[in-house]
Amino acid sequence: MASLQSGGDAAANGVDADVDGAASPPSAKRPRAGAGAAAITDAEVRAEFAHHDRAVARLNNGTFGCCPASVLAARARWQRLFLSQPDAFYFHHLQPGLARSRAAVAAAVGAGDASEVSLVDNVTTAAAIIMQHVAWSFAEGDFARGDVVLMFLYTYCSIKNSIHAYVARAGATVVEVPLPFPVSSPDAIVAEFRAALAVARDGGRRRVRLAVIDHITAMPTVLIPVKELVAICREEGVDKVFVDAAHAVGQVPVDVRDIGADFYASNLHKWFFCPSAVAFIHTRKDDPVSSKLHHPVVSSEYGNGLPMESAWIGVRDYSAQLVVPDVVDFVNRFDGGVEGIRRRNHDKVVEMGTMLAAAWGTFLGTPPEMCGSMLMVGLPGSLGVGSEDDAVGLRTMLRKQFKVEVPLYYNSKAAAADAPPEMVKDGNGDPVTGYVRISHQVYNVREEYEALRDAVAKLVADGFTCRKLRPPEKEETLA
């Protein structure tokens, strides 16, 4: 195989070249943050997200996140660097680049140092790493059959599936915390958690080996008092705590050391502007368990510690993990950096949610202090959302007929006991069973929320109900 003799070929591929002719890590081709640097303008924000479909009101940043054009360009440069000379990329650039990304993550989330951070594809992968370890603890006799894993009723489905696929099969008893919704205060969550923990411990006859706590539940979205729940776990002798923070980084302040969980994992492609897919898992380096965690994809790095095992799982595209420093540069172009973005997103989503609730005669599913950049808003009861199928059907109608993309939630559970009556029925006295989960990110504008407002108002004015979406046989079962 011929080697590059000069920088010409590398430059043609959009990468730089070392003096020996080998391609070097790509340099950014955009403004950098710095002292005295001008904040990003509205026009520049629009340009960064010009690849979004402008015909759609995009109110669902939570599921897939977003990535600005400048970061996508940086990713493409890494991809071209690999394609231009894969051997040099592997031997000289991949691991230093991933180390820079781990250091950037560690600084952003308050980790002790970069050795406590492992980069993975997503929180689903992080959960598999943890559940694999817990399953081995059962298989090797460290845990006894019947010992408990505690999780929320609203724990995300893939995490629940991981718990059952690994841990329940190994002999664990799974106990769910039945969180209320809508909810009017964090105290209701704390009370339910304490009650479920008491059930799990069964008067001290069972050991709770792992508690899985969401930082922000996905659906319905609720900001959980995670630090308080971790402290309760410590008081009650829970062995290990895993915080599923899939939506946290970029939505709420995160200090993993202050939170104090044994395992903390968050996606970076949801609210931190990374391309899909990249996440991290944090474990304290002084915790002996950290050396026992292994990536489920076993490679030549097996046994070299989770950060290194995760840094090489075979030939694949690592570019999403390599651009974290570029993302840090991007967020620092905004006034206040990521914290400024977070505060403005929170204020805007509350403002837009309040506007929608007032227009529809409904209410917010949580108080403002229990949300980040996503918020649940009740739909008019006359829409008759009576099942998860109804919620999916109505969401599809909003997408196809009104060009509004927003997740819907069917609430079949009771509200918190202390929830006021105005968080149960709408202004017409109809029970509220359907909710939209709106989000706000830097690219959103008021007109998108007004499109959702007007679409729902039109459906109500036209006398639409979800009965019209149901096939006849389904209608009979719900009658």
Swiss-Prot record:
The modification N6-(pyridoxal phosphate)lysine is found at K270. Residues 7-36 have a biased composition (Low complexity). It catalyses: L-cysteine + H2O = hydrogen sulfide + pyruvate + NH4(+) + H(+). Pfam families: Aminotran_5. Catalyzes the production of hydrogen sulfide (H2S) from cysteine. PANTHER family: L-CYSTEINE DESULFHYDRASE (PTHR43092), L-CYSTEINE DESULFHYDRASE 2-RELATED (PTHR43092:SF5). This is Putative L-cysteine desulfhydrase 2. It comes from Oryza sativa subsp. japonica (Rice). The lineage of its organism: Eukaryota, Viridiplantae, Streptophyta, Embryophyta, Tracheophyta.
